[in-house]
Amino acid sequence: MQLFPAIDLRSGKVVRLTQGDYSRMTVYSEDPCAQAREFLAAGAKNLHVVDLDGAKDGTLSNYDTIAALAKQGGLYIEVGGGIRTEERIETYLSLGVGRCILGSVAVTDFDFTARMLKKYGDKIAVGVDAKDGYVAIHGWKEVSAEPGVDFCKRLADAGCTAIIYTDIACDGAMQGTNLGLYRTLAKEVPSVAFTASGGISSEAELLELKKMGTAAAILGKSLYTGALDLARCVQLVQE
C-alpha cells in the first residue's frame, strides 16, 4: 500500500481545513517545500497536494508553489483542486506532476471526464467526496442524488483506474476512517485502485486498509498533530 502525506495549499501556506470548512483553517507551515522535504526524509515516496484556492475559485494562485514542489524532485506528486479544464491538466503535467485529480467536474461534466480519462489514462485520478454515502461537490456544499458506490462504478466503466474516496464526515476530524466503506468499494468496484482519505488516525487503521487491499492512503491532520509518525507508517505498510 502506498502512502500519500498531504499538503493542502492556501495562499502558498500549508493548511488543514476541518470537514472542508474554510473558516476552520489551521496553518501548519509557511514553507510547503520544507514540509515536503520533511516527508521525503521520513521515507515518503508520494505527495498529495490540494490547491484549496483553486478548489474555491478556480485560480492558479498556488502555481509557483506547486511548480517548486515538482521541481524539488524525489516524490511522485498528485495534484487536485480546481482542475476543470484540459489546459489546467496540461499545465500541471508539464511541471512534472504525476497525476491530476478531477473533483467536482467529474460529477458536473462526466463527458469531459471520460474524454480526459481516455486521453491521459493513469495521469488522471478522480476524487470522489461522499456525504452520508452520496456524492458531494463544490467544496462539499452540494450533495447529489447519486450514491458514491454507483458513481465509482460509472467512472470505472469510463476507464478510470484510480479513485481517491473521501468520507466527508471523517475528514480532518481525527475520529478514525470509515473502514467498512473501503471494504465495500474494493468488493463492488474491483477494477479501480482506491485511495482512502479522511480521518485516518491510527496505525491499526492503516494495517486494516492494507489488509483489505486498499491501494493507497492519504495522511493529513494525523501527521501534523503528531498522532501518527510518518517514518513508522511507511515502515508498517512496507512490511
Describe the predicted segments one by one.
Residues 11-12, 19-23, 90, 97-171:
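Conserved anion-binding
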Residues 83, 94-112, 167-170, 198-202, ...:
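Glycine-rich phosphate-binding active-site loops on the catalytic face of alpha/beta enzymes
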Residues 8, 39, 47, 92, ...:
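Conserved, mostly hydrophobic/aromatic
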Residues 46-64, 104, 165-175:
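Glycine-rich, proline-tolerant flexible connector loops at the mouths of alpha/beta enzymes
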Residues 48-51, 78, 101-102, 125, ...:
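Conserved beta-strand positions in the central sheet of alpha/beta enzyme cores
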Residues 73, 77-99, 180-216:
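Catalytic cores of alpha/beta
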Residues 60-67, 141-150, 175-184:
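Charged helix-capping and loop-helix junction motifs
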Residues 53, 58-118:
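Glycine/small-residue-rich loop that forms an oxyanion/phosphate-binding "nest" at active or ligand-binding sites
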